Amino acid sequence: MHEIITLESLCQALADGEIAAAELRERALDTEARLARLNCFIREGDAVSQFGEADHAMKGTPLWGMPVSFKDNICVRGLPLTAGTRGMSGFVSDQDAAIVSQLRALGAVVAGKNNMHELSFGVTSINPHWGTVGNPVAPGYCAGGSSGGSAAAVASGIVPLSVGTDTGGSIRIPAAFCGITGFRPTTGRWSTAGIIPVSHTKDCVGLLTRTAGDAGFLYGLLSGKQQSFPLSRTAPCRIGLPVSMWSDLDGEVERACVNALSLLRKTGFEFIEIDDADIVELNQTLTFTVPLYEFFADLAQSLLSLGWKHGIHHIFAQVDDANVKGIINHHLGEGAIKPAHYLSSLQNGELLKRKMDELFARHNIELLGYPTVPCRVPHLDHADRPEFFSQAIRNTDLASNAMLPSITIPVGPEGRLPVGLSFDALRGRDALLLSRVSAIEQVLGFVRKVLPHTT
């Protein structure tokens, strides 16, 4: 069998019978068993029984037989739903989230539920109950979070794609740390129905894939049209570099990202430095206020709609992560955010969106570009520091607050710690973003050429 380079070509190989869906399933299960130390999945039961099989009645659909995993805050009918927390252990969903239904309709097979940071409230996926997610490409280092199990499952070759959620960077941070692609679409692009929330304002369903091209292919299918983005059809463009996002970088992160820009300049991409001081100040008023105010009511309403009968305090009483427990206790007590403060932050969010529109127009740019995470991937021994959360989301949270589509791609050199480079576009310009960044990744050439489990 020839090398399968892209998700689209893997789909074609399945459709043509070059590889059998059952064989792809067995390879995924074998890889998961061999790499069990990574704790990519939350399995309440054996993996074989929880890994779906291709429905031959669906043959001919675009993703027929394709294994896809889901972060464990996403409802999958008949599978456990834990949101990564001990207090929900044993709860089984009786419904599919909207995104699961969409992917099933396209022929995808549910591979299982991915481990995550407890209740999505962190960026390390160090989970005291379900186990720490390992980093497949940097053993001993943090996999990122909160969609860490999803990123690790893709990076290790267990599955070619996974679905996660992103509130302030929870898809893009682990993607960057694990050396893959993470895509957060324009907020609201895909329904969050059937997902255990953090914040209805900021939460977003997104994709973890090997490449931006794969993300673009999936985006097209989920949008109702099959499309790919060949380099020859995509001209270089003008990209803004926000000053704040390029400041105070780890040396290794800076070198990798600057080197990537240098390669792109040689092929005609234009970069302009942007003073974003007023944007930074406005953005900081939303970062924690909005999600921490919305979390408690959103979680309670979501659990009620899913048939949870024990109340949220049953869950909070069993939280294992000390940082998560501290955040919850503080904001249920003296740190509770006042309604007036929350409403003011929402108004700032509307202003931020207008300012981003103005910034793109004023500088005549199509994209923003910046290092996904300003610090290097931390060793697990040093990752669980309370201050690391703010450091990790420093750059990613702007897209979340301004509701921009955002994508990270790997730019770290082989043999070194992974580094991610992110790009944002204006709201609603997801296809443009994916087209441009698919071209960028082909210029940079930092993509591993073969899906590990398909050769």
UniProtKB/Swiss-Prot annotation:
One of its GO terms (biological process) is auxin biosynthetic process. SUPFAM superfamilies: Amidase signature (AS) enzymes. Keywords: Auxin biosynthesis, Hydrolase, Plasmid. Hydrolyzes indole-3-acetamide (IAM) into indole-3-acetic acid (IAA). The active site is at residues 71, 146, 170. One of its GO terms (molecular function) is hydrolase activity. It comes from the Bacteria. Its EC number is 3.5.1.-. This is Indoleacetamide hydrolase. Belongs to the amidase family. Pathway: Plant hormone metabolism; auxin biosynthesis. Signal peptide: none annotated. Pfam families: Amidase.
